[in-house]
């Protein structure tokens, strides 16, 4: 398996992966996520790849893209300033899970974050995504905060 930087030629494969996540979210929380044909328009994808504060990776097995990840470099707004590598999205193809691909992708993010001068890696995961919560805990991450809601 090869982990490499994402290119504009990866759009169709990445869109397929992102739709897997979006469809799972829509099944779990239809009040928050509506079904859609594409996770993001091609133009938005291209803009992300051109953004100097965003890095995107794919995991490739033979000719197949089996995982993708978007990471933004942010400056902390806390009293203790630190650069943060924020994982916007990390998706492993459902047919390829439980094979260490997510762990390898996460390790690549860590290497990139250290080289970029980040002091920590952060991400947000919805509480209905127990698979992701379990994976991130196994990678050494710990919960930072919770957001609560009440439907009126």
PLM ranges: what are they?
Residues 113-124:
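Conserved GNAT acetyl-CoA-binding A-motif
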């Amino acid at each position: 398996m090869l982990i490499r930087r994402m290119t504009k030629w990866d759009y169709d494969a990445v869109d397929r992966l992102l739709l897997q996540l979006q469809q799972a979210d829509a099944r779990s929380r239809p009040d928050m996520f509506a079904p859609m044909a594409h996770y993001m328009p091609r133009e938005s994808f291209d803009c992300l790849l051109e953004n100097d504060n965003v890095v995107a990776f794919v995991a490739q097995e033979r000719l197949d893209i089996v995982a993708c990840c978007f990471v933004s470099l942010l400056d902390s707004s806390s009293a203790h300033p630190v650069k943060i590598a924020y994982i916007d999205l990390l998706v492993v193809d459902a047919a390829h899970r439980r094979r260490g691909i997510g762990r390898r992708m996460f390790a690549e993010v860590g290497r990139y974050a250290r080289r970029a001068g980040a002091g920590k890696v952060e991400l947000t995961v919805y509480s209905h995504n127990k698979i992701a919560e379990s994976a991130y805990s196994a990678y050494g991450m710990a919960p930072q905060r919770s957001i609560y809601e009440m439907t009126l």
